[in-house]
Amino acid sequence: MSAVLPPVLTVQVDSADSSLAWASLGERRWRCVVGAGGVREDKVEGDGATPAGTYPLRHLYFRNDRLVLPKVRLPARAIGEHDGWCDDPRSPAYNRLVRIPNEWSHEKMWREDGLYDLLVVVGYNDDPPEGEWGSAIFLHIARDDMSPTHGCVAFARDDLLEIVTLIGPETKLNVHSVSAAEQRPRPRSDEDDDMKQFEDFDEQDW
C-alpha cells in the first residue's frame, strides 16, 4: 500500500522576483502575495524575500477583540497588547514570541492595521533559529491593495479565515516559483508599478 502524503498548502509565484502568487490546497485556490524581494532560497534577515522551500505550520495567533475564530486544528492563542516577535539575530529569543517592550529589536503583534488580526506561524528558521536567515515568516491578512509583504505570505481576510479551518499540524507550506532559477533582487518602491503588475497577473489564463 502506498503511503498517504500529508496535505500541502502550495504557494506558487510567477517568477522568483515576483510578489504575486496563487495558493492551493487540494482543489481550493486563493490569490495571495509574498515578499517584495520575491521568493529566494538564500533568504536573509531584512531582505524582504519569502523563503523558498517546504515548511511546517506551527500555530496561529488572533485578535479576539476583532474576530471570532472558527474551529481550527492548529494550536491557537489570542494576541495580547504586550506581545512582540523578536527579529534581532543577536538576541537569544531571535525568531520567537517575546513580551514587549524589551531591549531587542522586535515587531509588535498587536497592530492597528489589521494585518495580524489572524496569522499562522511558519516553521522557518526556528528549530533552532540560526544566524541571520530571517524571522517572523507568517501567513497573515493582506493589505486591501494586495501590496507585497516583508517576507510573509498574505491573503484576503476571508480567504485566510477559510484556510485556517482546512489546515492542521500535518499540513506543510510549500513556496516556489515557476522559474526557481531566477534569483534577482527586486526592489519595489513604485506603488503604481506594483498595481500594474497585479493587473497583468490577474489577466493571465489560469
What are these regions (language model features)?
Residues 1-149, 159-206:
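Cell wall/extracellular polymer interaction/catalysis modules
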Residues 156:
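Conserved "landmark" site that anchors the functional core of diverse proteins
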Residues 152:
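Short cysteine clusters
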